[in-house]
Swiss-Prot record:
It catalyses: L-cysteine + L-glutamate + ATP = gamma-L-glutamyl-L-cysteine + ADP + phosphate + H(+). Pfam families: GCS2. One of its GO terms (biological process) is modified amino acid biosynthetic process. It is an enzyme of class 6 (ligase). This is Putative glutamate--cysteine ligase 2.
Length: 371
């Protein structure tokens, strides 16, 4: 199969996708209600889209093409409200968070759709274990070479996105010690990690053709990279974030990525080399394990600083672009998180410490989602 033609899109437009937990209101375990939710929202009017995901305990919402923080926030609130109304009719709850705190993966039921059934047959139990919940952000790119430049430039900031969105400290009744345990599930897949270092679309097409010829992949969907190009949309897709506990946080993170993209493509502050990836896995691990307190290493200078410090420095550098995009309010929220060095994982641990119950913690997650 040939690689899709890259459809040039309006630079720095963006879209947000959020995978949501569907839980019962008895003990707040995951429940099988995605099909019923899809049935109830038929005929409802809302921006963007709502689609099923790989198991019956997940559902995905996505915005349309957004230009500003205000637009994204409005669309996310509108879609969220439609889903909450349907969930209330079914007496089920909805929650953000990258993992469910105590669900047992073996209880999951694969959603009845051809691609999901194919993935279940291919990956076995990994497909059910993949009941984890992420935020994806698409960024519009003017041409395919710019998309690849942005992809590799953005890779240096992957620890920021992980630490800011981290909301998965608990897995199967255990505090994992991680801020984002979700990404450990993603790493189990053979085509995860980072994209190959190709800076021209011609080189990327050659790589894709070789992979197709091996029989390992059929389409871009088979790559689970942290950032991947989406030729049919004319975007790059940043895929490392946990689903935050609120749509407000999701919008702020999306606009941080949008503003950073404008800075990277217009100012071109980075000279890209494959050596940029020498510390990629280390920095990624630090963000997953320690959140905003984690260490990140500059691959060119060797300088070490906390991820929170690196975010605050980055916010200063991209401030002029925030003014152009109307994203100052979003970046103020990001700055406040970095200064306080807290994220949703911190909040979840605080609730559990107070309540001594993961069931109650998930109940409060559901309340956060409605705010």
């Amino acid at each position: 199969m040939a690689l899709e033609t890259f459809v040039n899109s309006e630079p720095f437009t963006f879209g947000v996708e959020l995978e949501i937990q569907v839980v019962n209101t008895h003990n707040y375990d995951l429940t099988k209600a995605a099909s019923d939710l899809m049935r109830l929202i038929q005929g409802e009017t809302f921006p963007g889209n709502i689609t099923p995901e790989i198991t019956e305990s997940m559902i995905e919402l996505s915005t349309g093409i957004c230009h500003t923080h205000e637009q994204a926030l409005g669309e996310l609130h509108a879609i969220r409200d439609v889903l909450v109304k349907a969930a209330d009719q079914l007496n089920v709850g909805l929650a953000g968070g990258g993992t469910h705190a105590f669900q047992q993966w073996s209880d999951r039921q694969i959603y009845d759709a051809p691609r999901f059934q194919y993935l279940s047959e291919l990956y076995g139990y990994l497909a059910k274990q993949f009941t984890v919940f992420g935020q994806h952000v698409h960024i519009g790119c003017p041409d395919p070479d710019s998309a690849l430049f942005l992809l590799h430039s953005m890779s240096r900031f992957i620890p920021h996105f992980i630490a800011l969105s981290a909301s998965s400290p608990f897995v199967q009744n255990v505090d994992t010690g991680f801020h984002s345990a979700r990404l450990n599930s993603v790493f189990a897949f053979p085509l995860s990690g980072r994209a190959p270092f190709a800076l021209t679309w011609h080189d990327f097409e050659e790589y894709f053709t070789k992979m197709v010829n091996t029989g390992v992949v059929n389409s871009m969907k088979d790559f689970y990279w942290d950032i991947r190009p989406k030729p049919g949309y004319g975007t790059i897709e940043v895929r490392v974030m946990d689903t935050p506990l609120s749509v407000d946080r999701a919008a702020a993170i999306a606009c941080y990525i949008q503003t950073l993209a404008r800075y990277l493509l217009i100012d071109r502050p980075l000279t890209l080399t494959e050596d940029d990836y020498l510390v990629y896995t280390f920095n990624r691990f630090e963000a997953c394990r320690f959140g905003l307190e984690g260490t990140c290493v500059n691959p060119q200078t060797g300088e070490r600083r906390t991820i929170a410090e690196d975010i605050l420095d980055t916010l200063d550098r991209i401030a002029p672009h925030a003014a152009e995009l109307g994203s100052r309010a979003a970046l103020d929220e990001i700055g406040a998180l970095a200064k306080a060095r807290v994220n949703d994982a911190s909040w979840l641990r605080t609730v559990f410490k107070q309540e001594k119950s993961l069931n109650e913690t998930v109940r409060q997650q559901c309340l956060r989602w409605r705010e």
